[in-house]
Structure formats: structure tokens, C-alpha cells
From Swiss-Prot:
Pathway annotation: Amino-acid biosynthesis; L-histidine biosynthesis; L-histidine from 5-phospho-alpha-D-ribose 1-diphosphate: step 4/9
Record family assignment: Belongs to the HisA/HisF family.
Catalytic-site annotation from UniProt: 10
Keywords carried by this UniProt record: Amino-acid biosynthesis, Cytoplasm, Histidine biosynthesis, Isomerase
Subcellular location: Cytoplasm
Substrates-to-products reaction catalysed: 1-(5-phospho-beta-D-ribosyl)-5-[(5-phospho-beta-D-ribosylamino)methylideneamino]imidazole-4-carboxamide = 5-[(5-phospho-1-deoxy-D-ribulos-1-ylimino)methylamino]-1-(5-phospho-beta-D-ribosyl)imidazole-4-carboxamide
Record's protein name: 1-(5-phosphoribosyl)-5-[(5-phosphoribosylamino)methylideneamino] imidazole-4-carboxamide isomerase
UniProt cross-references to InterPro entries, sorted A to Z: Aldolase_TIM, His_biosynth, HisA/PriA_Actinobacteria, Isoase_HisA-like, Isoase_HisA-like_bact, RibuloseP-bd_barrel
Leading EC class: isomerase
Molecular function GO labels: 1-(5-phosphoribosyl)-5-[(5-phosphoribosylamino)methylideneamino]imidazole-4-carboxamide isomerase activity; phosphoribosylanthranilate isomerase activity
Gene3D superfamilies attached to this UniProt entry: Aldolase class I
A single cellular component GO annotation: cytoplasm
Organism field: Corynebacterium efficiens (strain DSM 44549 / YS-314 / AJ 12310 / JCM 11189 / NBRC 100395)
Superkingdom to which the source organism belongs: Bacteria
Length: 246
């Protein structure tokens, strides 16, 4: 099975942006989301990681724009940001997105997420953003600012509820181009049978290939944002490199 690369398009106020360590106010704009999404599609992406940051930060929504773009694309879309109840979930699923990621609500509403996982199965992934605090990995919600509990306890609960996939981000790495936290990702993969999507810190092709080595441990995908926008390497180069691994 080929390692999957998901180029990211994060949206703030109708623009494609990247943040530094997920912090509001650190946005750097990269044009329109449609331009970015079409560029990644043209370069051979099979998936797009599409994030409504305004919704994630509880300060608005780019839903209509993102729904329209999702409908225009020929590739699979993983949609995330601000999906916290049945209404926002149904709206996200109605865009035709292949997968919907849920973050904060998976931490704060355990009974609801259990029901969502039961009803929608593989269409749902859970975003687990974490930060190391006083030697403990703590989960983060609401735009990565609120505490959602101990990582391993949260993971055990969601795993027992049947979550089909986890997207794991070390917040301190996101948007920094300093390399992924491979040890953390491997530890999480070892604690669940669900596949892991790695997120945060990718800077070089070596970073991508370094993660792809651990497919047999359960890390089967990676989200890449700033490295592509800052031209550290092209999406085509990354896709070719992982294809050679087989």
C-alpha cells in the first residue's frame, strides 16, 4: 500500500493561510483556497486536507466557500474545523467530503463522538492535537488552546469507541518546518490498531520518507502544509519519492 500524502489548505477569512504552531494571529497568506486546491490536484494529489480555521477558533465560518471548492475537485477531501454537533457534521458530510475530522468535540463530548463513530464509521477521523506539558502529553481543543485531558486516556477511550483513524499533531511542531515528532507518532500508532495520519513539522523529503518507513507500524499518511507553500520540495517530488518505496 502506498503511503498517502495529503497537501493541506487552511482557510482564514476566505484566504489560504499557514499558521505557526497553530496560533491565531500568525497567519501567512498564500492566495485563494481554490488556487491552492487545484494546484495540488494538478500535481497529482489523491487527497486534500481542508481546514476551516475560523470555525476551529470559534470566530466564523468559511463553510460555503469550502463546500463549493470540495464539489469542484475530482480528488478526495478530508474536511475539518469547527465540527462540534450534528448540524455542523451533517453540513460537512453534505459537501461530498470523503472524510470528516472531528477534534474538540471528540474531547469534550464523549457520548456524542461515540454515536457519530457508530453511525458513520470510516467517514470519521479524530484529530488529536497534543502539547507536552510538565512531562505529560495533553490533548488540545478549541483551536489548540483548551486542555482536553491526558493523551493516552483520550486515545484509549476513542479506540474502544471504534474510531477508524487518528490525525496526530504535536502542536509545537505545526508550521515550524523543524521535522515531525516521529517518536510520539510511533508511540500513538503502537497504542491503537487504527491507522495514524501524521501532521506537523514536515520540512524535507527525508522527513516524509522517514515517516513512510513506519507504514507497517500504522502510520499510513502525512499532512504537508508549509513545506509545500514555501517550496521546500514539490508535491510531485514527494509523491514520486514515496512511490519508489513501494
Amino acid at each position: 500500500m502506498t503511503f498517502t500524502i495529503l497537501p493541506a489548505v487552511d482557510v482564514v477569512n476566505g484566504q489560504a493561510v499557514r499558521l505557526d504552531q497553530g496560533e491565531a494571529g500568525t497567519e501567512k497568506s498564500y492566495g485563494t483556497p481554490l488556487e491552492s486546491a487545484l494546484r495540488w490536484q494538478e500535481q497529482g494529489a489523491e487527497w486534500l486536507h481542508f481546514v476551516d480555521l475560523d470555525a476551529a477558533f470559534n470566530r466564523g465560518s468559511n463553510h460555503e466557500l469550502m463546500a463549493e471548492i470540495t464539489r469542484q475537485l475530482d480528488i478526495k477531501v478530508e474536511l475539518t474545523g469547527g465540527i462540534r454537533d450534528d448540524a455542523s457534521l451533517e453540513r460537512a458530510l453534505a459537501t461530498g467530503a470523503t472524510r470528516v475530522n472531528i477534534g474538540t468535540a471528540a474531547l469534550e463530548k464523549p457520548e456524542w463522538i461515540a454515536d457519530v463513530i457508530r453511525r458513520h464509521g470510516e467517514k470519521i477521523a479524530v484529530d488529536i492535537a497534543v502539547r507536552l506539558e510538565n512531562g505529560e502529553w495533553r490533548t488540545k481543543g478549541n483551536g489548540w488552546v483548551s486542555d482536553g485531558g491526558d493523551l493516552w486516556e483520550v486515545l484509549e477511550r476513542l479506540d474502544s469507541q471504534g474510531c477508524s483513524r487518528f490525525v496526530v499533531t504535536d502542536v509545537s511542531k505545526d508550521g515550524t518546518l523543524t521535522g515531525p515528532n516521529v517518536d510520539l507518532l510511533r508511540d500513538v500508532a503502537a497504542a491503537t490498531d487504527a491507522p495514524i495520519v501524521a501532521s506537523g513539522g514536515i520540512s524535507t523529503l527525508e522527513d516524509v520518507l522517514g515517516l513512510a518507513k513506519y507504514q507497517d507500524e500504522g502510520i499510513d499518511s502525512v499532512i504537508i502544509g508549509k513545506a509545500l507553500y514555501e517550496h521546500r520540495f514539490t508535491l510531485a517530488e514527494a509523491l514520486e519519492a514515496v512511490e519508489k518505496l513501494g
